[in-house]
Amino acid sequence: MVVIDRAPFPRDKVCAGWITPAVAAALELDADDYRRGRTFQPITGFRTGRIGNGEKDVETRYPRPVSFGIRRCEFDHYLLCRSGAEVRPGTALTGLRREGERWIVNDEIEAPIVVGAGGHFCPVARHLGGGGGGEPIVAAQEFEVPLDAAQDCPVRPEVPELYFARDLKGYGWCFRKQGVVNVGYGRFGSERLSAHVAGFLEFLRARGRLPASVTGRLKGHAYLIYGTAPRPLVGDGVLLVGDAAGLAYAQSGEGIRPAVESGLLAAGVLLGARGRYRYEDLAPYRRQIEARFGRRDAKPGLARLIPSRVLEALGASVLGSSWLTRRIVLDRWFLHAHQPALSPALHPSA
C-alpha cells in the first residue's frame, strides 16, 4: 500500500480534535501507548450555550470520559505509522488515468485500486465527478496555540465549551487540552464567515472565556454534510472515504468517526473483493455506508427549511434545558452514544 499526500507529515489539520470511545474501540487504539508523548485529554463534560449577551450556559457532566481530546498532527501521524504503509509525503496527485484494469498514478505508480481520502478537495473525488463546485458546504476557521503557564485560561481541559449561533446554522468551540487551546467556528455556507468568527471571538473574550493574550492565525476548512450533495462513492477500481466522500455528521459536522468507520468498511469490502475491483465488486461499500449513516437522498436538512425566527425559539428551548441538552445535543448529535462502535474485525463482504 502506498499513501501519497502533498503535505509533509506530521501535518496540521483544521479540527476541534476529539474522539469518542467508539472511535478508539473501532481502531483498537492502545490508549496507554498513544498517550506517551501525545495529547490524550479525557472529556467528562461540556459547557454549552448560545452566542449573545445575557445567555445562560448549561454544564453537563458525565461519570466517565465520553471523549478524548487529541491533536490531529499527532493522531493522523500515529495511525499512518501504525498502518505500515509506504508513505510519500510532499507528493501531490498530478496524474490519474485508467489503463485496462489498473490505475497509473503520477506516471510512476501502478495500482489495481485507488482510495480517495484527501478531504473535501480530494482530486480522486473530482475524478469520480464530485467536488466540482456549487456543493452546499460547511466552512470553518480555527486556531490552535500553546498555552503559556502564565496565561490564565478559565476553560477546563475536561469540559470543552460549545456555543451555538442563534439561528442554529453554526457553532463555535473553545477546547483546552493539556498544553494547547483550540478555538474555532463552523457554519453552513461561507457567506460572512469571517464576520461570524470575529463575533464569536469577541463573545468569548467579553465573557472572560478566552484571554486577550491567547490568539493565533486562523486556518480555514470546508466539508460536506452527509446527504446534502451525495458524491459517487465507488467506480471501477476506485472508492472514496471520509470527507472526500462527504460523510460528516449533519448536526455536529464531525468527520473523524465517519472517516474511521468508512475506512474500515472500505477495507472490509476490498478484502472481500479478492482482487476483483470492478464497480459491481465494490458496490457493497455504498450499501454499507447507507446502512451505517442513512440514505443519501440529497434532501435539504430540516434546519434549512424552518424559518429563522422559529429556529431561534427552538434553539433557546433546547439549549436552555439541561435534559434536552444532554439527551439531544450532546448524547445524540455530538457523541452519537446511541450508535454502537463499529467492530474492528474486517470480515470479507458477501
Segments predicted by a language model, with ranges:
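Glycine-rich FAD pyrophosphate-binding loop
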Residues: 1-15
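Hydrophobic "anchor" residues on beta-strands that sit immediately upstream
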Residues: 1-2, 108, 112, 239
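Short, solvent-exposed loop/turn segments at secondary-structure boundaries
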Residues: 13-16, 129, 186-188, 251-254
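A conserved beta-strand/loop capping segment in the N-terminal third of enzymes
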Residues: 18-78
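Short glycine-enriched, charge-decorated loop/helix-capping segments at active-site entrances
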Residues: 63-67, 130, 254-256
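Predominantly flavin-linked oxidoreductase catalytic cores and closely associated redox partners
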Residues: 81-212, 228-232, 246-247
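FAD/FMN-dependent oxidoreductases across multiple families
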Residues: 95, 191-270, 275
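C-terminal helical "tail/cap" subdomain of flavin- and related membrane-associated enzymes
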Residues: 268-350
